[in-house]
Regions:
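Terminal targeting signals and extreme-terminal segments of soluble enzymes
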Residues: 1-296
Length: 296
C-alpha cells in the first residue's frame, strides 16, 4: 500500500472514500482509493493497494536480527510494558518542551492503541545518526474480532473481512509520530519549522495469521491508560485472556535534504523474531536555515 497526502483534512467534516478497481488477476488484485471532503477543493488523500493470495513458501529469508540480543536490555528495562513511557499523539520537541510544561495536566493519548516508547538513549548516544534507532511497542485498545482456530488450521483458510482489521491496526500504528524521528536523530528537533507527510508505504511480508492481536485482558496494570467504551461494547475485555499481544516498530532515518526527509521502519513480532512488515515514509521536513546536524 502507498498513500499520498495531498490536502489537509478538516476534523469537523466527514470524509468520502471512493474505491476504483484497477485489476483482478489470478494472484493479485489492485485498487485505487481517493478521499475527499468538499469535492471542489480537491482530493485529500489517494492510495494504490495491491492484494496477493496467500501461498505456501519453501523458505523464509529476512534480515538477521537477534531482537533479544540487540534490544532486549531496552525492552526488559521495565518489569511491565506499561512501565515504559506512554507516547503522546504528538511526540514532538515542541509538545514536550513548550506545551507540556505550561499544561502539566494535559495528556493526549493515542486513540485505538497502547503505544509505549522505549528509552534508547544509551543505545543511540555513541552512534552516528544513521545508525540510531527508535523502538515503539504497541497493542490495540479493546478486543479485536478473533479468527476461529478451525480457520487458522485450514489448508486454504477463508478469512472474514474482520480479519483485515488486524492488518489495518498495524498500518495505523506504523504512522504514529513518524517524521519526528528525523529531527531527534539529527539532534535538531528544536529547529523544526514544518513537518508533514508526503507519502507513506506499507508492505506486509506475512499472512494475516501472523498479524493477529489478542483480545484485551480483563486485568490490566494500574498504569495502563484507561480505555473508554460504551457499556456492553463488543471490544470489552476478555476474562480468558491473561496477557496482551505486543508488537514492535524499529524506526530510523537515513536521508534528509532540501526540505524533505525519509522515515524507515521494520515491524517485528518480538516474541518470534519474525519481520512482519516494512514501511517507508517521504516527508516534508523543514528546519531553521542555520541548523547543523552532527556529521557521520
Amino acid at each position: 500500500m502507498t498513500g499520498w497526502f495531498t490536502l489537509g483534512g478538516m476534523p469537523t467534516e466527514h470524509f468520502v472514500y471512493t474505491v476504483h478497481k484497477i485489476r483482478d488477476g489470478g494472484n493479485y488484485c489492485v485498487r485505487s482509493v481517493t478521499v475527499t471532503q468538499i469535492a471542489e477543493k480537491g482530493v485529500c488523500f489517494t492510495a494504490t493497494m495491491s492484494f496477493k493470495r496467500a501461498e505456501p513458501s519453501p523458505f523464509r529469508f529476512q534480515h538477521k536480527l537477534d531482537i533479544k540480543k540487540e534490544y532486549g536490555p531496552y525492552i526488559e528495562a521495565k518489569k511491565n510494558m506499561f512501565d515504559h513511557p506512554d507516547m503522546p499523539s504528538q511526540d514532538s520537541w515542541w509538545f514536550h518542551n513548550v506545551h507540556a510544561p505550561k499544561n502539566p495536566n494535559h495528556f493526549n493519548p493515542l486513540g485505538g492503541l497502547h503505544l509505549r516508547k522505549l528509552n534508547m538513549k544509551a543505545y543511540n548516544e555513541y552512534r552516528n545518526p544513521i545508525d540510531r534507532r527508535r523502538l515503539m511497542m504497541y497493542s490495540t485498545r479493546g478486543s479485536m474480532p478473533q479468527i476461529p482456530a478451525s480457520v487458522l488450521k485450514a489448508k486454504k483458510p477463508k478469512y472474514s473481512r474482520e480479519a483485515n482489521l488486524h492488518a489495518i491496526a498495524h498500518i495505523y500504528a506504523s504512522d504514529r509520530n513518524s517524521l519526528f524521528v528525523i529531527g531527534d536523530h539529527l539532534e535538531i528537533s528544536a529547529d523544526a519549522r514544518r513537518i508533514a507527510t508526503i507519502s507513506h508505504t506499507v508492505i506486509f511480508h506475512v499472512g494475516v495469521e501472523e498479524l493477529l492481536f489478542s483480545n484485551e485482558p480483563a486485568d490490566e496494570p494500574s498504569n495502563a491508560a484507561p480505555t473508554e467504551r460504551a457499556s456492553g461494547a463488543a471490544d470489552a475485555p476478555d476474562p480468558s485472556v491473561t496477557e496482551r499481544k505486543w508488537y514492535m516498530q524499529e524506526v530510523w532515518t537515513d536521508r534528509a535534504e532540501g526540505g524533505r526527509g525519509l522515515h524507515r521502519s521494520r515491524i517485528w513480532d518480538p516474541d518470534t523474531g519474525v519481520h512482519l512488515a516494512t514501511t517507508i515514509q517521504d516527508g516534508l521536513v523543514r528546519f531553521k536555515d542555520n541548523s547543523s546536524p552532527p556529521k557521520l
